[in-house]
Amino acid sequence: MKQLIIFSILICSFCLSCNKNVEKISTQNTLYNNLDGYYDGKKLSASMERYLEQWGQTEPSQNEFYTSFSYYPLKGLEYEEGVSRRDPSTIINIKDTYYVYYTRSSKTVAPVGYKKATKTVPANTWDLCDIYYATSKDGINWEEQGVSVSRGPEGSFDDRSVFTPDILCYKGKYYLYYQAVSYPYTERSKNVIGMSWSESPEGPWHRFDTPVLKPGKPGKFVESSNKRAHIESYGDFDSHKVHDPNLIVRNSEIWMYYKAHPMGVGSEHPMPKGVGLKKPYPNFSMGFAIAKDPKGPFVKHPLNPVSASGHEALVWPYNEGVATMITANGPEKNTIQWAEDGINFEVKSHIVLPPDAAGLFCEDKYTNTSNGQGFTWGI
């Protein structure tokens, strides 16, 4: 089980020089330039080309996107035997009080996996959970306040578990978005994103009775198996699960980034009928959807997925664009990326020991800013 911790961030204020002193006029790995120590016609390695052009001759600490992390234990939300607290939301400050929302289980036995799980015994640490919230005056000392959003009524799309929340502040109201599953919870269960809203950060919360985002076009599972990896076709990049929503307000619209799974996660391993299938999408990617209203409809972007790496979605406005922290999975993991349009992300910095599934305190996340200032701490 995870213990919630607070982290602080040092973001350097230097700007990338980004190839201002190097003019590339050959496609044959030859750079002509006026830099000391280099001569016209000198051939360079691919690494040196990147150093001069992409990284602008800077050391990591001179890069404005370079980030280091320090970690401190939270007070008030310490580890508790038999209880899972995880997946903190964006942190908000309302009337000098910080609020964070998170996945929490009741005190129960240890998870037993999908095959052995029952209506009262969890399959994993995010099973049989509700959305709780805690408050703080200083961001370090926290007090758990109770349930914000509980599981839905029996037979509903969210009757098994609600988890991985994020909070949106929009036009004087508050919206919680979260991953949801129904009973029975198996390897092949579809995951959706639900929503509840309130006029206060403390509730009461009004549950939206249908998901606001669902998986995309499905593939086909092998009927003779119950394994998620055993498929006949993949479907869309998010054909199996949409979850870990993370939101910003931009262009007066609600922008939702989310973690996505295709059907067939793990299908690179041998399976009854799936051997030889060409895998079109990574196991973990980041999707993007836009809505005019917090209740939707959320329209998925045609360039999805907007990141082929990462685990949870984590975004914030930065300068005139959108930044994202990519962790845990994929060829571009452990990087800070940025896109002026919020869609076509590029690696801007590599990072070490980033927080997984973090919740950020970012004051301008919902302000529709065109000059994002970043963030300095989170949970």
Residue ranges, per PLM feature:
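Positively charged n-region of N-terminal signal peptides that target proteins for export
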Residues: 1-4
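Sec-dependent N-terminal signal peptides
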Residues: 6-10
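C-terminal motif of bacterial Sec signal peptides marking the signal peptidase cleavage site
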Residues: 14-17
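Carbohydrate-active catalytic/glycan-binding domains of CAZyme proteins
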Residues: 22-379
